[in-house]
Amino acid sequence: NRHGGGAALLQYPEELHTIVSAVRRAAPAHMPVSAKMRLGFNDDSHAVECAQALADGGAEELVVHARTKADAYRPPAYWERVNDIRLAVNIPVVANGEIWTVDDARRCLQASGCDSLMLGRGIVTDPGLALAIRRELWGQSPHDAEGQMPVTGVANAPPVVPWATILTLM
């Protein structure tokens, strides 16, 4: 941020558009381009404008951390502002921020209107959180019939590899 990157870019929606457009042009057509943003830098007054710049630039999915840079990681997360963004863009929006429990996930989905979540610090403190959310909110087994984690989200995303498989490769 001291060098104008990261969340500082949220002060310059046109720069966000330029960057995502360049990534979209450089990436193979079959490879999805996604972006992650906070609600803003000092405040959330440009949140929708930034989200539209990212979507118009070619992002096919947008993750929104429901706080500004100035908010840092202090509660609360403003999930209802994620809903404002979701309604303003024509790409899938994923809610992120302050999801520590299944109940938090439920409240986040309701307030944001999103169909999916990105977990951050909550999954570090509870590594089983994603599986608990999948089971409790969506009634899904953590694995499909072939024992693989089902892929959700953007089409053409790389396959999900179970952690146990990754450990055998180390």
Residue ranges and their predicted role:
Residues 1-4, 65, 127, 132:
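Active-site-proximal loop/short-helix segments
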Residues 1-16, 67-78, 141-142:
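Glycine-rich tight-turn/loop motif centered on a GG-T
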Residues 1-48, 52-57:
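Active-site entrance/lid segments in N-terminal catalytic domains of soluble metabolic enzymes
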Residues 26-28, 32, 44-61, 73, ...:
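Alpha/beta catalytic cores of nucleotide-metabolism and tRNA/nucleoside-modifying enzymes
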Residues 36-38, 65, 96:
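Structural motif
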